[in-house]
Amino acid sequence: DKTSIQMIDALLLEYSLDTQEGILLMCLAEALMRIPDSATADALIRDKLSVADWKSHLKNSDSVFVNASTWGLMLTGKVVGLSSNEQSAGQAVNRLVNKLSEPVIRKAMHQAMKVMGHQFVLGRSIAEAQKNGKSMRDKGFTYSYDMLGEAALTTADANKYFKDYLMAIEAVGRDTYVSSKSSPAPSVSIKLSALHPRYEVANEDRVLTELCDTLEQLLRRAVELDVAITIDAEEADRLELSLKLFEKLYRTDLVKGWGKFGLVIQAYSKRALPVLVWLNRLAKEQGDLIPLRLVKGAYWDSEIKWSQQAGFTDYPVYTRKEATDVAYLACARYLLSPSVRGNIFPQFASHNAHTVSAIAVMTEHKDFEFQRLHGMGDSLYNHAMEAYQQSVRIYAPVGSHKDLLPYLVRRLLENGANSSFVHRLVDARCPVAELTQHPVDMLLAFDTLHNTKIPLPPAVFPERKNSYGVNIDIESEAHQFEEQVKGFLNNQWTAGPVINGESLAESMIKADQNVEQVTAPYDRRINVGQVAFANLDHVSAAITGADAAFADWNATSVETKAAALDKLADLMEDNLAELVAICHQEAGKTIHDSVDEVREAVDFCRYYAKQADNLQGFELKGFDGQTRIASRQGRGVFVCISPWNFPL
């Protein structure tokens, strides 16, 4: 029943992310925390709230908090959106209300974010979090503390997070709290990107030395105080790097025989199950238990967008929520199997009642634990602990209000999403039968396993093919491509004027006319090739030739010109490796930047080829009733000077 739902749950239910108003509130709340001055904040409120239909939500909720919020939103949104006729009747009053309501809404939004912060964050400091968590520990629950904050951008950021994590380990290790019930010892979760400003595959050598040393210091203290450590999962491109780092530290004498150094695996990743198999083999070889938190995944929206922008052939994650749910159960079944028991200690993190029940049914032992987020799944896990007598650990973020935003937005997206189990659970309009459907049945009910509403990255543009990209952060893909590029690195390229379709480079180089050697900017000892520079005679000949060819080219159909651009795009993609090698050697670009440059050139060609429809002739009716045909004509010969930093 809605009346029993906490006020934040009621607000999220009424303004869910499948409504325009819910999306507006999310955008507004997210943006307001970034705006330092009141005037700009009020202008944003005035702009955003005037376009929504707040009246339709009035009295839909039984929550006084929600209805009061709706009245405030109506006051700001509707007054700003009044027509000129309505404004004329009481313009002065309306202006007064407008000025009053924007600051009120601003303060209310900031206060709402703080209220939601208390819902999802256990404390501003580790000491406050431990104090606030005592009531749950008295009930038998335990915690995994994590310090709020996103990726470090500087060494100073990384040093700050290092001190925060060290302080958390010290506090947890020295905690003298004794539970009246059997509450397992708390642990600490660590986000690797917070500990190094260059936690990326391109800087693998630095990560496996500098970040490894930093993490080793934290682990050393954790082992001394016997505080379990879990490495958080992050973006798909960092998966292999995180596994290399984990393996390097896991095989050291520092953690040998400890069995409390673990990590997080995300089930929405198509590589999740193979990674579990690899970790199981690693644990068998080393002989030490690996605690492993299995989650659904936290970066789905970003992974989809990044893959589309990068032009990958496919996505690293499943595109249907039902597929992720099935993958989670498949991973859970593997983790509970006899071949894994004793090697990996499963920690199942989920707020889906069906998932929790399925795990309880499929297991034949109790060597695992459940996990949930602070502020979510309270009633579910109160029941689970009582019904299954299984330990439950609460993932509890710790930090100040200013560090809350990114984490809070992820939680609101999870809670507010229309497909979220948590969202549907508190929605009285959702039939119970829908909540209890098996995810396998739900997945098989679709015609395709992939989500047809999410096109593959190559087909993301409706009017043209996306340019092809290479994921150089995935070893299996990067190794093959880098080998292709290496095959061209010793090439000696030549360049020179091309006049009337004929290259003069070879003849000019033989005659040593205006020839210069080209060397790599990153190492002048590397000779890339030779270039023969044009003189004034060449320039004149080129302009004369282009001018002579202009009439024929101008008469050429737009379709033929567009086909030439498409052909050029295809040829550049076919020769991607060599073009990347040239960009790398001649301009000193990284492989990643070189791939991006080729992709941009390809996309330009395809984009302008598709503009052909806009260049066709069209009819115009004159004032005399006569029909006239309007057409576009070429303007003549142009000189184009390409930018030095984008040579392709």
Q: Which residue ranges define each predicted feature?
A:
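A general alpha-helix detector
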Residues: 7-11, 28, 524-527, 545-546, ...
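Structural signal for hydrophobic packing residues in well-ordered secondary-structure cores
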Residues: 29-36, 137, 169, 173-176, ...
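Catalytic cores of nucleotide-enabled group-transfer and carboxylate-activating enzymes in metabolic
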Residues: 111-131, 136-146, 153, 217, ...
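Hydrophobic alpha-helix feature that most strongly marks membrane-spanning transmembrane helices
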Residues: 223, 254, 284, 336-340, ...
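Terminal low-complexity tails and localization/encapsulation signals of metabolic enzymes
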Residues: 399, 403-406, 410-544, 548, ...
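Conserved coil-to-alpha-helix start sites within the AMP-binding
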Residues: 644-648
